[in-house]
Swiss-Prot record:
Keyword DNA damage: no
Domain of life of the organism encoding this protein: Viruses
Alphabetized Pfam families for the sequence: DUF587 (PF04532), Herpes_UL87 (PF03043)
InterPro entries tied to this protein: Herpes_UL87_C, Herpes_UL87_N
Protein name from the UniProt record: Uncharacterized protein UL87
Family the entry assigns: Belongs to the herpesviridae UL87 family.
Alphabetized UniProt keyword annotations: Host nucleus
Length: 941
């Protein structure tokens, strides 16, 4: 891009030999020399000159932009990067340096502007030539710093970073005598422009036009945020001022244009709020329709109400609580209700607003106060306009109360043609939600105002409004700065070790560093949420709805299965459907408590219970309490089934999991009684055989056979409790885990997504023990691998609908009452005993501890003795071997006493060659003298 032809301003311009215009040069000039600020003396006068009105020459502005574009470093090659560098110089703004010349400076007259001003200093004393003898064109000058001297010339340009000017030709020699070397040590420098290309205030919006041809508004906003973060808080005000000048905030348009632009701004913001609402139906469209109608009816008052600060308390004279609750639910706003204090009743002015210290976003009606969230001030003001300012309008924004036809907002027709700025919003059913509902009725104001001929001034407001839509990009950069400041100390240590002196990373001109940091942040957040999920799969509904929560510590893994969860949510009843079907809506007295259950529904498919609580506005809103076991899709399925029985308009998600109960089994323990010993800060319940362990304010109940229940928590809280419980188990002195069995049973749980029943576990335990008996303990690893592969292939899979091992109400409801009552039991000692009365997770040692030798046949006793002998041989702790030894002694002694061959049980003889105990000779184990044992039969109700 070629620059414009130079003009004469006080002296001759540079004479170019060759017939063609030579591109204007931008020179490097220091602004700080040995910590002396050269710009402070002329700052006031230069600011006045910069703000002085001056006719804008578009060609001169293009020449300035072209000169700055050519002044970019060589390594900045792409056009967007070069334009960003030009934008960075414009954001730092204009600057001027005074100097004194003892004569005419040859070759640099186009950059020196004559002036006569006494400066206290510092200022530059410019020599004609440097003492080093350098005769390079444009680099032959030298300078010294003076004070209390008259300045004869001024150098004007744009403030820049020294790193941006490294490849620019310098006005002064780089030798130590010339003084140019001292300026390179400073952070800031000046890109000196020719004197006929100096900038003024009115030139900035036109420079933004040149920038906008390459960069979008969002890219400009991101770059401004990045520059502010890179240069620090000291330079941020200067950057913000020049950033606003680029969009023409200094221009004050005429009154009609300003009013139209402000109205368009409010309309655009209201339409953005409307498009951000999830539900588009009669409730939401009626709300925005009334607000927009009041905006066109009383523009000034509504605009002032929408700008009310959060400290101002808004008082209402009319209010409908049931309608307000419904609107808040559909808008998904968090509000809290309370009593209006005496300080809130003080009103100020005609708007009915009172001030109160310490309270924010308050909406008061008589003795009721509604508090909005800190970020919902705009919504608070919208409700104030809806209930207070628009109370004299009809239900749909008109004074004559027209009949509602559809979900749209019916408005009075306009007689004049709509202007392009008067756009419409389309509702969910296709009807138009007009943003120009009513014309202004004030006297002397016409329906159509003449447009301002200065259309470029309106475009500046449009640019500012468009920039507001990209505020989230700046928020990302601020979060990135915060994360970088938290880890700044570690980065400085790494930088010092690597030998670099500047710990600040190089400035990112293209934004690639910011994009990489944001992608890394998203990846880490994704992994942090799913670090405990099986195979890192995404859990639909979140971790709170996970059916299985698995954690591991070293080699110990535990899977916690959800038994049931209680979910609270709200739903809106369909009053239209009820009236159309002839159903009378229930009318409840105002004094009924909200904790009272109005009615309850129990379903078999899916198995759940839905309780509906009392509400004073039960015609519109109900609070639901869902008790269910299952995943998030099953929960949504249950809501669909519930909707078939009750006239529900909408369910308001997300739901809140207020209570979640889980059950877990610790597999592979050789002695399961150890887990309830060696525990501190525990207590035993008197009416239930359970040991309570208090962890993270949650009472974890441990039953026999290493089974536990964890109430109230889910998700990350449940994982934290499980990890602490595993840490306690791991540090117990007498705990020994058979990792072969532990791996098999953990795989079975994950494969079937259900806890292992009693019979299925006993089958695997005794099958593995018999294999060890047949093949020897030397083949233990091979046998464990064989059993694990069989479990992986589904040989030991089991059904979820078995009820012999569960008390879960929902499972019984799922399979039916007849099958649920047929729970298998065994008849022992003339008493019915549940099949899993020893515990669902009981192992071989736990079962053998409770076996009575005189009640079972001798052949089975022989098998149990041999199995216990195998377990004693492979046990890893002396404690477990001692417990097995005592169990064997009890079984053999009981069998000997029953046979009547000896009066006292003889001691067990354990040989050194084999760990399997020898059975006393007085006891026959071959079955020849088998005593008469009570008949064992199955009984069912």
């Amino acid at each position: 891009m070629a620059g414009a032809a130079p003009r004469r301003l006080g002296c001759d311009a540079l004479i170019v030999v060759g017939g063609s215009a030579m591109p204007r040069r931008v020179l490097h000039v220091p602004v700080h020399v040995r910590a002396c600020n050269l710009t402070q003396e002329l700052s006031t006068g230069e600011d006045a000159r910069f703000c002085r009105p001056r006719p804008v020459n578009v060609e001169r502005v293009r020449a300035v932009f072209a000169a700055l574009y050519r002044a970019c470093p060589i390594h900045v090659r792409t056009e967007p990067e070069r334009v960003k560098l030009v934008l960075g110089r414009l954001l730092l703004g204009p600057v001027a340096v005074p100097c004194f010349c003892d004569g005419e400076v040859e070759g640099h007259g186009e950059h020196l502007v004559p002036t006569t001003q006494f400066c206290r200093g510092p200022l530059l004393y410019v020599h004609r030539r440097c003492c080093c003898g350098s005769v390079t064109a444009g680099r032959a000058l030298s300078y010294h710093v003076l004070e209390n001297h008259v300045a004869t010339h001024v150098l004007r340009g744009l403030l820049s970073l020294t790193e941006w000017n490294r490849e620019l030709p310098s006005l002064f020699c780089d030798c130590p005598g010339g003084g140019g070397a001292s300026g390179t040590e400073e952070r800031y420098a000046m890109a000196c422009l020719p004197r006929d290309l100096s900038l003024h205030l009115d030139d900035y919006p036109y420079l933004m036009v040149e920038i906008g041809r390459v960069l979008s508004v969002s890219e400009v906003d991101d770059y401004v945020t990045a520059v502010s973060g890179y240069l620090g808080e000291a330079a941020a005000p200067r950057i913000q001022v020049h950033y606003k000048l680029l969009f023409g905030l200094n221009v004050r348009p005429q009154a009609p244009c300003a009013l139209d632009a402000t109205r368009d701004f409010f309309l655009l913001e209201l339409q953005k709020l409307w498009l951000g609402v999830e539900y588009h139906h009669e409730v939401t469209s009626e709300f925005f329709g009334r607000v927009l109608a009041q905006l066109h009816r009383d523009r000034a008052r509504v605009m002032m109400a929408l700008r009310l600060p959060e400290q101002t308390v808004c008082h209402l004279s009319t209010f409908v609580l049931s309608r307000f609750k419904r609107q808040v639910l559909y808008f998904k706003l968090q509000v809290s209700y309370g009593k209006c204090r005496t300080g809130h009743a003080d009103r100020s002015g005609g708007g009915g607003n009172g001030g109160n210290q310490g309270h924010h976003n308050l909406l008061c009606y008589r003795r009721l106060s509604v508090t909005f969230a800190d970020t919902d001030t705009v919504w608070r003001n919208l409700f104030y306009v809806y209930y207070e300012l628009a109370r004299d309008l009809g239900s749909h924004g008109t004074e004559n109360r027209p009949v509602n036809r559809g979900y749209g907002v019916s408005c009075a027709p306009r007689t004049s043609r709509l202007s392009p700025s008067e756009s419409t919003v389309v509702s969910a059913n296709g009807h138009a939600l007009s943003s120009t509902a009513l014309p202004t009725t004030s006297a002397g104001h016409k329906l159509s105002l003449p447009r301002d001929p200065a259309a470029d001034r309106v475009r500046r407001y449009v640019c500012i409004i468009s920039r507001l839509m990209y505020a989230r990009y700046g928020e990302r950069w601020r979060k990135h700065r915060q994360r970088r400041s938290e880890t700044g100390e570690e980065e400085e240590e790494e930088t010092l070790e690597s030998g670099e002196t500047d710990a600040t990373p190089p400035f990112d001109f293209t934004g690639q560093q910011l994009r990489r940091a944001y992608q890394e942040h998203r990846r880490r957040k994704h992994l942090a949420v799913q670090r405990y999920a099986p195979c890192r799969r995404k859990l639909i509904g979140g971790m709170e709805f996970a059916e299985v929560t698995g954690v591991s510590l070293d080699r110990i893994a535990v899977n916690a299965f959800n038994t049931n969860r209680v979910i609270n949510m709200k739903a809106a009843l369909s009053s239209i459907a009820a009236s159309g079907l002839g159903v009378r809506a229930p009318r409840l007295p105002k004094n009924m408590t909200h904790s009272f259950v109005m009615y309850k529904h129990t379903f078999k498919e899916p198995a759940c219970t839905v309780s509906t609580f009392v509400s004073n506005d039960a015609v519109y809103i109900n609070s639901l309490n869902v008790n269910i076991r299952g995943s998030y899709p099953e929960f949504l399925y249950s809501l669909g089934v519930y909707r078939l029985h009750v006239n529900i308009d909408h369910f308001f998600l997300p739901a809140v999991v207020c209570n979640s109960n889980s059950s877990l089994d610790v597999h592979g323990l050789e002695d399961q009684a150890v887990i309830r010993s060696e525990r501190s800060k525990v207590y035993w319940t008197t009416n239930f055989p359970c040991m309570i362990s208090h962890t993270n304010n949650v009472n974890v109940g441990w039953f026999k056979a290493a089974t536990a229940i964890v109430p109230r928590v889910s998700g990350a809280d449940l994982e934290a409790i499980l990890l602490k419980e595993l840490s306690c188990i791991k540090n117990m002195r007498d705990v020994c885990i058979d990792y072969g069995l532990h791996r098999v049973f953990t795989q079975l749980e994950l494969r079937n997504s259900y806890q292992i029943p009693f019979l299925a576990k006993q089958l695997v335990l005794f099958l593995r023990a018999c294999l060890l008996k047949l093949h020897g303990r030397e083949k233990r690893l091979q046998l464990d691998r064989l059993v694990f592969e069989a479990a992986q292939r589904g040989l030991f899979d089991y059904s979820k609908n078995l009820t012999a091992h569960t008390k879960i109400k929902h499972t019984c409801a799922l399979i039916g009452s007849r099958l649920a009552n047929n729970v298998p039991k065994i008849l022992a000692r003339n008493k019915k005993v549940k099949l899993d009365h020893l515990g669902r997770n009981a192992n071989v040692l736990t079962v053998c501890r409770h076996v009575e030798a005189h009640k079972i046949p001798r052949t089975r006793l022989k098998v149990l003795v041999e199995v216990l002998g195998v377990l004693q041989s492979i046990s890893g702790t002396p404690h477990t071997r001692e417990v097995i030894h005592q169990t064997l002694f009890r079984l053999c002694s009981a069998a000997a006493a029953t046979s009547g061959l000896c009066s006292s049980p003889p001691p067990l003889c354990v040989s050194s060659s084999s760990s399997v105990p020898s059975v006393p000779t007085s006891v026959s184990v071959d079955g020849s003298s088998e005593p008469t044992s009570p008949r064992v039969r199955f009984a069912s109700r």
